[in-house]
Amino acid sequence: MLKRTVLAVLSGLAILSTPMVAAEARTLDEILSEGVIRVGINPNFPNMSTRNDAGDWEGFDIDVGNALAEGLGVEVEWVPTETPQRVPFLVSDRIDISLGALTRNASRAMLIDYTVPLHTEVLAVLATSEIEGDSWEDFNEDGITLANMRGNWTVGWIEENMPNVELELVDTLADTVRLVAQGRADAIVENIDFFMAFTENHPDVDWRVVENPIFVAYCAIGVAQGNENLTEVLNILLYGMHSSGMINETWEAHYGSPMLREVVPTPYF
């Protein structure tokens, strides 16, 4: 965990060392007056935000963005925003808010503001009943093969923190789950929420998530720094969406299972 913390700090320093010229963000009054809110979404994030066969956007973030816009009484302008562009697009006023699983961390909070949490990300172990283990450390053994995806940051985390395992890398979420289902890998160590829907493709496998997660991160909506009125209204809308169960129901509809660690709504923010 120490190594991961050091990497996170270095990553944060890299962000802070990158020149970003802050533009004046649109105020809540301007958004309401123009009748449009610009929402940054990942253009290729299955179950979160992607285009369907008809070319329309769909996914968890899309439903959330539409609900927020409805609460504000405005229309949505979807702005494709790749993962590295989320903070720069807020700082440069290309978007009003950023979705796309924007994890809270201190380095980003020096550049942008966050709402209350929207959802969580849980780094955990997805395995089957064919293999024993009550914690992620139990899987750090010779003879264990973990499935993962090329380019995922968790590959580096596994190499540093679970040096005894073998890694089998593929290119998609579905292929990662398939490796375990076919017995070509023993488990997956990842942000497991994003993989759960694909376990339904293999109903004969007795899937299980190791109870103790490695860590839980909170993802919130990114807002331009100092845009307090917009942030406050979004927080109130999110509190209502969490309290009504809309967030959890929408998550389960798109991911096929409940959030592993649900966000507990609080009226204080």
Residue ranges of predicted features:
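Extracytoplasmic small-molecule ligand-binding "clamshell" domains
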Residues: 25-101, 110, 169, 253-254
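Periplasmic-binding protein-like
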Residues: 43, 119-127, 192, 196-239, ...
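Alpha-to-beta junction loops
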Residues: 37-38, 74-75, 92-100, 143-145, ...
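Extended ligand-binding regions for polar small-molecule ligands
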Residues: 63-71, 130-131, 137, 152, ...
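A ligand-binding cleft/hinge motif common to bilobed small-molecule-binding domains
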Residues: 85-88, 102-110, 159-160, 181, ...
